[in-house]
A protein has these predicted regions:
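Non-catalytic cap/lid and distal C-terminal segments of serine-dependent acyl enzymes
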Residues: 1-143
Length: 143
């Protein structure tokens, strides 16, 4: 099992799709696909850090793209992690979460659950509640 919030949620999706035999279930909270973020190399420190981590250019067709990794598992007919994904309605990155939601909802090969809570944003109160729901999803605790 692996789970994370925000950037950590993206990282958990990335690692679970890269190593599904090790991470059979993933919880991703407020976690969009970073490959869906438009990148403008403006010379800022943030841009330079991104280039050091991922390289310069489009990440969609690289190992850093969540949907790219998910497509590879389908093509290879590999095992796939179960995915619990949640985001607050007021989260500033809700659009990136919707892109992932739409992708996984349209690919029945994945055991995927999405939860979106009204009137809550990118915050710990939401993540604490969703972590409990994720643990129920895993079967580690009862409802």
């Amino acid at each position: 099992y692996v789970s994370g919030f925000s950037n950590g949620g993206y990282g958990c999706l990335h690692i679970a799709l890269k190593y599904p035999e090790k991470y059979g279930t993933v919880g991703a909270f407020s976690a969009g696909d970073k490959a869906d973020s438009e990148f403008l190399n403006d010379g800022s420190e943030k841009s330079l850090r991104r280039i050091q981590l991922y390289g310069d250019g489009d990440l969609h067709k690289t190992e850093y793209g969540i949907t790219y990794q998910a497509d590879k598992l389908i093509e290879q007919e590999s095992i796939k992690p179960r995915i619990y994904h949640a985001c607050g309605e007021l989260d500033p990155w809700i659009d990136m979460n919707h892109i992932l939601r739409d992708y996984f909802m349209s690919h029945i090969e994945y055991d995927y659950v999405y939860d979106e809570i009204e009137q809550i944003g990118h915050e710990w109160k939401f993540w604490r509640e969703e972590l409990k729901r994720f643990l129920v999803f895993t079967g580690l605790i009862n409802n």
